Design a protein with these regions (language model features):
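Acidic, metal/ion-coordinating pockets
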Residues: 19-202
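Positively charged n-region of N-terminal signal peptides that target proteins for export
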Residues: 1-5
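Bacterial N-terminal signal peptides
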Residues: 7-15
């Protein structure tokens, strides 16, 4: 599935870049479920660079950045993957359920280490080392404003992402769709409103 996704991304990026003039073109690229597969970053970097040659790019990540590569998963703060995302130029990211696998303290440190904002509108930090994240960011590209509002699944047991209850202590997760709807007002001040989510197809 990961190879199929990467192939589709490469083809889509090439097609968009081939026909897109530089002026007033903004391409939004999203990575998702990377699962620490850092061996795929060279191909991904090539695809992103080709798009940037002909258009303005916003690069986002929809969660599950680790759990899947022993080297990355044992590294301090999962930094090898984050460093590659810094090099790739990610603009914003949200949380997936596997971000919590590392424990709340490690996740908090990883969020602090990121050079891009990590956002999530439906996670409430009540008694957790994880900071209360901003619900959205607004990015300017080609004179237009792009708002990204983020949410993570709460469809697991006890209304939190999939995982053991213990790793979510001190956190509360509101309904993702209802929370996203609260930010419809951003349409009044932005030209584009994007839901950056890790909520599956439900």
């Amino acid at each position: 599935m990961k190879k199929i996704f990467l192939g589709i991304l490469l083809l889509l990026c090439a097609a968009l870049c081939a026909c897109a003039p530089r002026e007033k073109v903004v391409i939004i690229l999203s990575t998702n479920d990377i699962h620490a597969q850092i061996q795929n970053f060279p191909q991904l970097a090539t695809a992103v660079a080709e798009c940037r040659d002909t258009a303005s790019v916003i690069l986002v990540d929809a969660g599950d950045r680790w759990t899947g590569n022993a080297y990355v998963d044992q590294a301090e703060g999962r930094r090898p993957g984050l460093e590659l995302m810094h090099e790739l130029g990610h603009d914003v990211a949200t949380l997936g359920n596997h971000e919590f696998d590392v424990g709340q303290q490690t996740l908090a440190e990883a969020i602090d280490y990121c050079r891009f904002p990590v956002i999530c509108a439906n996670m409430v930090s009540e008694n957790s080392p994880i900071p209360q994240l901003k619900p959205y960011v607004i990015l300017d590209r080609e004179g237009e404003k792009f708002a990204f509002v983020a949410a993570v699944t709460n469809y697991g047991y006890n209304n939190h992402p999939d995982g053991h209850d213990a790793i979510f202590e001190g956190l509360r997760f509101m309904d993702a769709v209802r929370t996203l709807e609260e930010y419809e007002y951003l349409r009044d001040s932005c030209q584009v409103l994007v839901a950056l989510t890790h909520i599956g197809s439900k």
